[in-house]
Amino acid sequence: MGTIFASCTVNRTPMDRQPHQWLCERSSEDVECQRALLALERLPRHVAIIMDGNGRWATARNLPRIAGHREGIESVRDIVKASAELGIGYLTLYAFSTENWKRPEAEVSALMRLLEYYLRAELDELDRNNVRINAIGKLVALPKRVQRILTRAIERTAGNTGLVLTLALSYSGRWDIVRAVQMIALDVRRGKLSPEDISDELFGSYLSTAGMPEPDLLIRTSGELRVSNFLLWEIAYAELYSTATLWPDFRRQEYYHALADYARRERRFGMTSEQVSASSNSVPYRTYIKELFDTIVQRRKG
């Protein structure tokens, strides 16, 4: 098995991030799983996640909903670390939607405190591990104390070149699209643009995600089959992965399964299957490595 891994190379463009050795101990089994994933040669550049199920996780244990949100932070920590270790360039987490403001005031306040706690507690480690923090959404709606620590985190990590961790806060896809339309209309009225200038590329440059590649993989936990107003423009060609696992239970092993599932899919972008196959001769090899990865995971469970 070691010989197989040694013979594998990962093809990356200069803009792709390189795998990062997070500054902590990892098990040999985890390292082996990551090697198998890297050997697939087809990891997503940008992963977006709808983190769902915190409340149900807590209810199933007769705990207050905030307990589920606290445990969900542990999943965030683990998935961020795993993403950086695998060299994934962008991870976008749907942390708080515009619709979430409708929740009970006590829960919203607790969520804001947890967000502030996470940023304060994790900032040093994220910075040491070359993670760049970003945020999208109607950030002025957040409490001032959260805005301050968020601004500090963004500014402090602005020069980092590793994983770009984007937190979607007070965010909705429709809000972002309407905002982009308003700004384009204003620029047309000011004479900076003409209607003929408007294209997919130009429209994307007015979104809060401008400068980021579109998500390759959208993961949703808790088994729900909807996108919940998340990155509506950007996920046009994203591969979707839904799991019944609730977010507090979603850790790196299931994340690895989602990534392996993505790697074996055929992304067509409007082309036929024959056209895609003609442009890539590595599908049988990826299938073989996927089977090898599944064997490793099953051995761990045993």
Give, region by region, the residue ranges found by the protein language model:
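Flexible, compositionally biased loop and terminal segments
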Residues: 2-302
